Amino acid sequence: MADEGGNPRDLPPVGGHAALSRHIGQSLMADEFDMSFFRDKPLDHGFFSPMSALLPCDESWPVQIVPLQVGVLQLPIPTARRCYKLGQALRRAIESYPEDLKVAIVATGGVSHQVHGERCGFNNPEWDAQFLDLLVNDPQRLTEMTLAEYATLGGMEGAEVITWLIMRGTLSANVERKHQSYYLPSMTGIATLLLENRDQALPAPVNERHRQHMQHQLAGAEQLEGTYPYTLERSAKGYRLNKFLHRMIEPQWRQRFLSEPEALYREAGLSEEESDLLRRRDWRGLIHYGVIFFVLEKLGAVLGVSNLDIYAAMRGQSIEDFMKTRNQQVRYSVAGKAPN
């Protein structure tokens, strides 16, 4: 739960669906949408405000979620057309997920409003009604509008409704409007729209072909000896260790690591296996486990171990034998000068 300035709201945490999240991420990347992936990222009112009104949440939530955050305030931002295409790609991702799940796509963001400058307080209920009608019946027309046109009709912050096109892109051309409401209490138009798909299930070979498409870029890499692509699955497994080692950039953290490592392992919630890999300085084992090299070299800098020594250990060679394979006999690390 994000603290947005006045302490977090009194709501329970919500669980995610990690496997579906990874599948969606990999599918969107395969469809050429450049995604960033997060752990430990608090959610704000964009999720909790609408969902706490829709679902019971006294002690827990009855759903698992996959948050998809799209920046629409700091320019440059995606176009309306790009958002719609993202929705279409999201549909392919969900339909190709091998497990049979019920999935609802929730779009958030206020309709007409502006909350900055001399134009703050601007609303346009007529545009809001037109937008909702177009979203249901002719979403392609909405993809032709520029950000300036959205801002003119609905306020600068009201342009965030382009994210609703992501939701609409996941649905079939024809949808059933189950519910619609509109409310303008103060600064922001609040609309609720419930749509139901009218599509048919795809033949199984279509979804299988998409899953193969998702694997295309790495096809064959599994045959490379001693090579471990840093996939989302490996990242998830090694997350605690990678987070622990990344904190070596903090002077106090690395000092505590050198003086009281066991206490630090416990504080970070490392498993016994993870702690033992660090105790033994098992460079190869750390890579096998799911640690990315670029935090291993931070550990090496703290311990006074060069990158070349780590490379040699990963290859199972002495540093002398490894150096014979290099053009220059030089050792280096990411360590800087110690402060005076």
From Swiss-Prot:
It catalyses: 3,4,5-trihydroxybenzoate + O2 = (1E)-4-oxobut-1-ene-1,2,4-tricarboxylate + 2 H(+). One of its GO terms (molecular function) is ferrous iron binding. NCBIfam families: PRK13367.1. Ring-cleavage dioxygenase that acts specifically on gallate to produce the keto-tautomer of 4-oxalomesaconate. Mediates the first step of gallate degradation pathway. The active site is at H45, H113. Belongs to the LigB/MhpB extradiol dioxygenase family. Keywords: Aromatic hydrocarbons catabolism, Dioxygenase, Oxidoreductase. It comes from the Bacteria. One of its GO terms (biological process) is gallate catabolic process. Its EC number is 1.13.11.57. Induction: By gallate. The keyword Ribonucleoprotein does not apply. It is an enzyme of class 1 (oxidoreductase). Optimum pH is 7.0. The keyword rRNA-binding does not apply. This is Gallate dioxygenase. Its cofactor is Fe(2+).
